[in-house]
């Protein structure tokens, strides 16, 4: 088993896909699941490249005032990483991402971007990727086969309750 690498850094902003980005002491960018801008966090590195790393928050040292408890703490990273912020913050970040995409191509928008919603915060999905997880029961008497989400940043799976 490979040695786990942990890094501590301050997160700067949200980038496309729902990750936060920060800069490591050596100058490499870190794309981080489970963090919010301005938070000081410790991450477990899940992918290491020469110019960047990817990771998952393992500890929040300084918490953002925007942070809320996710509705589904066991699987939110796999299913909906935006659950750690209020819907108003999510919409604001998504509008900023759209504006930034236009700015990168030197396109000036005539108006500020507004994100419209039906107000439904949970139980909607844009994309679903499932797998299966097999295991034995606690008493080793029968095998189970459960529906599961893929765990972000790793090879594990998160069993969907009630399957």
List where the protein language model places each region:
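SAM-dependent transferase fold signal centered on methyltransferase-like domains
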Residues: 1-163
